[in-house]
Every structure is written in C-alpha cells, then in structure tokens.
C-alpha cells in the first residue's frame, strides 16, 4: 500500500455550545463530501452523526461520533477525520477527550446568540491542549444574526484574535452569500441544488467600503505575524499576493496567533464548502504538529515520536465504546508508526501485550474494516482484553507513555435498584461496562441504606445512563428519581351538609351529616386530621361516628385541586340524621368522602411545596451572580457570612426550583462553588406556580 502523504490529512473537531448547529454542520460536510446522499436533519431525528437512539430523540449529541471523509481542494484529495462533539455541559468529558487527539477545531458559534457558556468551556479546553481554531459563525439566516458582533465577542470574551475572512451579503432571511476578502470575489450560493454550486459576481457596491476596511485589517493582522510581509505592507500593500496572505495566515493559525472567522448557514446549505476549503487551507495536518512527547517507562527519560510511518508505533486510546455487533471498540489516535490488523501492541499501563484482531475506520456508528492504520490517523480497534480511556498503545520493543487525560469528579447522584432478581447480576455488569466507557460516571454502594448510587455530571447524564442500561443491556431498574412531593391544605372554614341516599328495592343506604371543615387549631400537634365530634342527643348513633372519621381520613389522600395528599384538616361533626334500617357504617363513610370533596373546594384549598435549606460556599467574585440566581429560583437569602476566605450564603429555596442547581452553580462559578441542601418545611406556593403544578398533575393523571 502506497504511503499516504500526511500533508493531506486533517483531524478536526466541531465544537460549540448546544444548539449552535454542530451536528447539522457535520451532516452538510458529509453530504458535500459524498458520504451521505441524503441530508439528515437533527430536528427530524435523522442525523447520521447522532447515532444513539437517545440522541435522535433529544436532538442533541452525547457521544463524540468519529467520521472519515474525503474533500477535493485545489485538485488534491484530502482525508478528513471529523469528530462531532457534544455541547451540553454534562458531557464535557467527551469534548475533553476529543480535543486531546485532534489537530484542529472548527469553533462553531450561533450568529444570534454569539459566545455562550459552553463555547467558553470548549475554548478553554482547546487552549489547554493548544489546538488551533477556525471560527464558523452559523445561523446567518436567522433574525438578529450579526457576524461582526460575534467576532467582537470572540476577542472580548474568549481573548482570541479573530480575523474575518468574509463579509456577509444580505441580512438575516436575505442572507445569500459572502465576499471572500482574500480573493476579493463575491460568492452567491444556488438554492436549487442544496448550495452545491455557486456563482461568482462583482462585489455589491454598498459593501465596497466594508470590504476594503476588513480586507485592510486582514492584511495588517497577517503582516504583523510575518516580518517579510510587514516590510511589503509598509512599502506597497497592494504588492502582497493572495498566496502570501494564505501562507502567512496558515502559519499564524497553526501558531494560535490568529483565529480566521467565516460565516454561513449550515441548515440553508450556505458557506459549508468554503469552511471545508479553509480547514484544508489553514488548519494543521498531523505533519505540521510537533513530535509528541512522552516518557520511556523503562528509563523514566523523556522521549519524542515524530509523526512518521517509519517511527515505532505509538497511539492513545481516547474513548471506549461497547458496540452491539463487534463488542468493545477502542477509539485511538495513531501518533507514529503503522499498525496492521492481526498484530500485537503493548498496553503500557497494564504491561500486557494485546492482539488487535480488527481495525476500523469509523463513519458515525458504522465500521469500515481496514488493513492497517498509519501515523496521524484516527481509527477504532477490537480485540482488547483490558483497555481504558487514556491508555498508551505502543510497539512491543519501543514503549513510551503519552500524557493521559484528567477528568472532573461527578457532581450529582441518584439511587438505582434492579426491578427483579434476574436484573441484579445484569445491573452490576451493565454499570461496570458503562463506567469503563465514561470516566466521569461512578458507581458506589451507600453504606447506610445499602442502595447502589450512580453519580455523574448532571441529571441528563444520569438519565442517559439509565436509558442505555435498558436499551443496550436489557436491565430494568427503579430509580430514585428526584421528584417534588407537593401537598394540599385549606385556608378557611366552610359548612357543609351531605346526604347519601340509595333506594333500589329491598334494603337501601342512608347517611346524613352536617360538618364544618377548616384549618387545624394552632395548638394541634402534627399534621393529618383533627376530628371533633360535637353532636348532641344521639342525632347520629355513636357506632357510626368512627366511620365518618375514617371516611375523611381516606379522602385526605386525594386533595381537591390536584390529587396530592392533604397536609392537615380539621373537621367538626355538628349534626346529622340516620335511618333505623338503611343506615350502616359504610353509608356514613361514603357520606364523609363525598362531603369532603365539595367542602374542600369551598374552604380555599391551596398547594404546598417543600422548602429546602440551601447553603452555598463560593469565591467572593461569584457571590452576586449566585445570590441573583437564588432569587430567580424564588429563594430567600437569610444570611451571608465568611468562611476561610470564601463567602457562605444561607437561603431557603423551593425544592422544585433546585433541580439542575449543581450544574448551574458549576457554570456560574466555573466549578469553584459548592452547595448542600436539606429539607426545612412546607409552604404555600404562589398562585402562578400552583396553576402549573395542578395542570401538570391533571395532565399526568389523564395519560
């Protein structure tokens, strides 16, 4: 097999905030590069890259799908490995793993929303691994789209040096093309063929001033980086050629001194091919990346491996996945040398040799078997007996340990228990496999309750783990789902008479009660039913009175508003009558149940919700944001104090507002604040919240 020239390989990731259009952009790339003949839409659940069922249902990307495609640029075929990374903060681990093995990133921004929190997180992660970037401002066809505003945010919020390479033609819904500032040509895409073709036209007159201004800025930015160009720039700016600009821009991008910025609308098929051209033009190939550093495990000395097929083999496993057809798949990036299917490698962590039975190139979750993999490529292999994320795989005779990856600790936990005896063993195995795949997911046993507690990076993360246990491992579990237990109570007194009569030949039914319903007395201890019998003169025989009390107690299990348990209730039985033949205990019990329903409606029933005591420990600079967030959650801040250099905020917040709080707190404080929460008391919900709760409860009851 002829050796491929590494110059024509690109390992790139597409990274951004959730909903900036990452998966749609990747789908367009696959369409234009000929891998996919039908464009998959995320909102249809048909996107090729979102291969897990959960992803197609939720319209978000959870696992980094790896895909391989080809692209022609300047009559040269390039090989591109693309990793589509998730943008949800719960799945930061996937982004971290991907960036570790990529050579370049297309940082995607929404033209409307600009730099969002996850864009910032991904940006910092890319800085950590020194990954060069190209900016693509997507959704240019949307209302409020502003390309240059996003460029400004990249400078101000991310500290990058964004340099626009294009000026958009047309605003929002009229967005139809761009002016290329390097070639000074205007490009208009044709809608008839999904933007496959475009027309080159003269620059619209109204854009000439903008084009000249931004082109001058581009040339100046590039000249600042390249001394030879700087001299030309001062002597005669017009003598700088297109190729010189491209060469200097490429060097500056790889050096992370400049972020080339482009724009388009992936959904409307505009701008994706130009972005692909820019990937080939400006982002590094494996050959541009310096030799990878590592440690020789035998000598402890630092060593480096050049990205060349003649060097000894070295690779890093960056993801382990369980595939239903081929078993355990290890995704890895080959940094040096060649690996043939059927050969042996050394896993430096375990010290064991492993036989690689098959090597695959991945297209989302479909595998294409290949004979060998070379330096600079990304692939997946099966046959490993013991492999973990971050393991180094090397030539048997030339071991090297590459820098592994570090992952954050989990932040949220829930209890799970198997539904049946048959599920017990399967659950242990499934959780073990899932923990093997995902370093931010942990499993432990609670010492007090003996329950299995699973922990992860957020509620969504754990939902998906439970879903995968069911779908992939056929394990049914009961989950300690954090759900709010609302209650109901009444706020005023109401008098009511209930007569229960049933005559249907033979012996009938009869009961007649007169009672007052109201809130419990202040000195009544506890909750539940306060029942007072004030009947005089045997109007209701004594043996029937306990049945009336029993009827009310039973009825309190269902509140009149939404069917929640009634927290407390006082019933005073005042009067009534009975029939010597037809009255019995059941008749009086039913009369109480029926009377309760009508009386409770008249007695001003309200919804109660659990209020939690919350304590947050935070650095001072985040305190304002955190207090503001607690107020937005209907929280009441009771106390603020100092504790060993940090601020402590004590508040009471409704439990219903606290779901997802750990994740928000992590975002607000960049992971530096911590919180604890415990139950305090029940309190009445505001009317707007009550309406929502009642509506939701009735909706659930009707399903």
UniProtKB/Swiss-Prot annotation:
What CDD domains does the record point to?
Answer: EF-G (cd01886), EFG_III (cd16262), EFG_mtEFG1_IV (cd01434), EFG_mtEFG_C (cd03713), EFG_mtEFG_II (cd04088)
Q: Does the keyword Cytoplasm apply?
A: yes
Q: Which GO terms describe its molecular function?
A: GTP binding; GTPase activity; translation elongation factor activity
In which residues is GTP bound? 16-23, 84-88, 138-141
By its UniProt entry, which Gene3D superfamilies does this protein fall under?
Answer: 3.30.230.10, 3.30.70.240, Elongation Factor G (Translational Gtpase), domain 3, P-loop containing nucleotide triphosphate hydrolases, Translation factors
Pfam families in alphabetical order: EFG_C, EFG_III, EFG_IV, GTP_EFTU, GTP_EFTU_D2
Q: Which UniProt keywords apply?
A: Cytoplasm, Elongation factor, GTP-binding, Nucleotide-binding, Protein biosynthesis
- Determine if Cytoplasm is one of this entry's keywords: yes
Q: Which GO terms describe its biological process?
A: ribosome disassembly
Q: GO CC terms on record? A: cytoplasm
Q: Which residues form the tr-type G domain?
A: 7-287
Can you say where in the cell this protein is located?
A: Cytoplasm
HAMAP family reported in the protein's UniProt record: EF_G_EF_2_B
In which family does this protein belong, per the annotation?
Belongs to the TRAFAC class translation factor GTPase superfamily. Classic translation factor GTPase family. EF-G/EF-2 subfamily.
Q: What does this protein do?
A: Catalyzes the GTP-dependent ribosomal translocation step during translation elongation. During this step, the ribosome changes from the pre-translocational (PRE) to the post-translocational (POST) state as the newly formed A-site-bound peptidyl-tRNA and P-site-bound deacylated tRNA move to the P and E sites, respectively. Catalyzes the coordinated movement of the two tRNA molecules, the mRNA and conformational changes in the ribosome.
| Protein name per UniProt | Elongation factor G
Source species:
Christiangramia forsetii (strain DSM 17595 / CGMCC 1.15422 / KT0803)
